[in-house]
Amino acid sequence: MADLGAEDKLKQICDALRIETLKPAEDEADAIVRNAKEQAKRIIDEAQEEASRIITSATEEADHKLKQGESALAQAGKRSLESLKQAVENKVFKESLAEWLENTLADPEVSAKLVAALIQAIEDKGISGDLTAYIGKHVATRAVNEFLGKTVLAKLKGKGVAIGKFVGGVQLRVEDKNWVLDLSSDTLLDLLMRYLQKDFREMIFQGS
């Protein structure tokens, strides 16, 4: 059975490293949000104009209906607006953030820095074992190995990084403990969306 104390340490390492990736991403996200705001505002304005026309027409008809029917229309309108917000988030914000993240993680030097940071983090926690580092499938292993250098490569099983099944980012596997420290692109995108989604909504959908 795995040592629960060590597993807690592993979780702390992953959390700390993921949070460190947020700072440059927040700066880029600000630019994405600014660029997206004009596009999102246009989409929302058009949708709200159409919604206003529909609501006006529906209101005239609703005057002849029971309050229960009017309430149902209001609820439907709220659900439609929420669906619109989610569509804008996915189209304007998430896709832009994913594209930026993919481009950033395609840099072999970035992958090398992430691998080195993960190795240093587990060493600082006193965790040892056979290590296998995986990088994104579109990143050149040779370039990453050159950035890592002989000292770090000597700590890896096979004396070099391996290609993972993910697009970008890295994973570090502690073989004898069957642990995987995950900083892959999908994991980082989910993390960034959770941290930045609220700020995006507040900026884009103010007053809506």
Swiss-Prot record:
GO terms for cellular component: proton-transporting two-sector ATPase complex, catalytic domain. Coiled coil: none annotated. InterPro entries: ATP_synth_B-like_membr_sf (IPR028987), ATPase_V1_Esu (IPR002842), T3SS_HrpE/ATPase_suE (IPR009335). GO terms for molecular function: ATP binding; proton-transporting ATP synthase activity, rotational mechanism; proton-transporting ATPase activity, rotational mechanism. Keywords: ATP synthesis, Hydrogen ion transport, Ion transport, Transport. One of its GO terms (biological process) is proton motive force-driven plasma membrane ATP synthesis. It comes from the Bacteria. It holds the Pfam family HrpE. Belongs to the V-ATPase E subunit family. Produces ATP from ADP in the presence of a proton gradient across the membrane. This is V-type ATP synthase subunit E.
